[in-house]
Amino acid sequence: MTNNPKWWDNTVTIYNKYSDPITNVVRWYRTVVSGCFWKRTTEKISLNNSVLESDNVICRIPENENFRQKYDWLQIPNDQMQNYFTLGIGDIIVNGEVTDEINEYTAGARSSDVLKKYADLGTMTIESVRINTKTGVLFNRHYLAKGV
């Protein structure tokens, strides 16, 4: 049982990108996680009498026994990677449970297609990750992904 706040009520689909170092074939592994927090924000910056806007997404994922840090996940044999997930720069998160498989070699199934297809649900390409599993009373143990 988790002690996450009641507003951590989102289910997300995480797509982990893996490039085989021998064959250079790109594969994506999909994982669905529930009990997450999802928030889209717009950041405004004033610069030289102009206002620049940037959309950002924050996703908090509760601590999970199947999570591996990126380096450790990359050491897992290919036939077992689907049993675990990671969060790394360039990985994709969709706000909601989706079943699409990403295949960069098939038109309509590429990562760009999935991002476009689910834009209304909410998607992010991860730009930074923080592992908050040693936090104190103020926050629950979780992984924080930020992106656009």
Q: Each predicted region: which residue ranges?
A:
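N-terminal intrinsically disordered, low-complexity, charge/repeat-rich segments that act as generic
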Residues: 1-34, 41-44
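Short, conserved turn/kink motifs that form compact alpha/beta structural patches or helix kinks used as
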Residues: 27-148
